[in-house]
Amino acid sequence: MKVAFLKPPVGGILGLEMLTFVEPLGPICVAACLEQDGHECRVLDLRIDGEEKGMAECRAFDPDVVGLQCNFTTERNRTIRLAERIRREMPRAFVVVGGHDASRDPDWFRHDAVDAIAMGDGEEVLPPLVNALSEARDLKKIRGLEVRDGDAWVSTGAADARPNLDSYPLPARHLIARYADHYYINFRKPLALMETARGCPFKCNFCSVWKFHESTFREKSPERVVQELAQITADNIFITDDIFWMNVRRGEEMARQIKASGIRKYFTVQTRTDIICKFPHLIEMWKECGDLAIFLGLESVTDEGLKAVNKKNTADNNVQAINILKDLGVGFTPNFIVDPAWDRDDFTRLREWIDKMGAYNSGFSILTPLPGTDLWDAAKKNVTTDRWEMFDIVHAVLPTKLPLDEFYGEYSRLWRHALDVRYKHRGKLRTYVQLGAAVATGKVSFGELNRGLGMAKTFTRPQTFLKAHES
């Protein structure tokens, strides 16, 4: 059968997805399994092609099955709009919606334009679904789906999670080769995504990853990781593991094997500060594999704040980890959660902490109850909007303690303060010289740089966020 995977076009209120623009890793992993079964696949990234060109190519391909990936709550409406268009223009195609958001709240996607909703690991759901369609078998016997049964919808039960991730084929990167130069992170391109593990054993209340994976944690072997790295031509790698180095011995062995292979990349990883504090030697080992940058979900500068989101970490670990990274010369990007219930003192405390620590690359997410999280279950009755585009973690969808304009005044001031701290610690001239060098060497285009700087400046203005509440 012919299967097309479509990534919906750019949308949202502020176009935040354009700041970090990454490849559709899920679809190319699923497509690899389908190709192994003898099916013909295409991956169309409408964020790059544009909707008209992408849809024209899809019609020319004439797929039997169209898969739409909806990973983020903000993508919901445009995913359904795209499904409706596919239904009009390719009426014989079977439309299935998958992705993280569809998995955590499948009932929302029960729509006339959708034939099935895939839940869980796509590699375990899509191949059996496509094979059943090709043989005209009963879809209700395929696990991991919500499917139509006349006018009703039927859940087929959860698909099993495969313990051995090494048994999956390598991602079908040839299907997105033409897009490779378009993907980037933090002004670095080209960028490839890579997964070395799935799941998370922690249970933060704002996150649905641990629920999606039912609190399991599965890993690929170091040998498989090196095999995947050898497949990737991009110089920059973002490792998608929610917590890197969970298994310390595996982290050490991966570093040893990558170094021995001669592969050198610019790695961006996500991890916890308690891991850095306990095992700083891991940072040193991975520095020998190329360059390293670390995203840190600090969430709060107080133990009370960490306890409120069930982080199972301490404010002291956050401080200690940053000092370790500074001593080792490793770049880091801290992210903090801004609670709508904050008063001015809370904002002041965070600004003072950033100034003290020199945490100039900080980012700030507004506490947002996303469907499928414990926070959603606890707070959904208090949500102030039904516009899913507002759930982009930079808009308040819960009541604010401060008047809304004052809340956004303080919120935008955080972004402005982080920029000021950067200039203080790194120097404004040095910052712009580094960015200019990135353009000159082709690591980023002038347009991408201009867009990123423009977005950073936009975030320092309260009206940027307020205007979404006025429409």
Predicted regions and their residues:
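Glycine- and acidic-residue-enriched helix-capping/strand-helix junction motifs
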Residues: L14-P27
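N-terminal [4Fe-4S]-dependent radical SAM core
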Residues: M1-A4, P9-L16, I142, R148-T196
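Radical SAM [4Fe-4S] cluster-binding motif and immediate context
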Residues: V22, L170-F336, P340, E352
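Short, electropositive alpha-helical surface patch
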Residues: G54, A255-I258, R344-Y360
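Glycine-rich beta-alpha loop elements in corrinoid/cobalamin-binding modules
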Residues: K2, G26, V30-R162, I366-T368, ...
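Flexible glycine/acidic-rich beta-alpha junction loops that bind and position SAM and/or redox cofactors
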Residues: G12-I13, R104-P106, G150, F202, ...
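Structural recognition of alpha->loop->beta junctions
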Residues: W108-V125, M285-I294, R349-F364
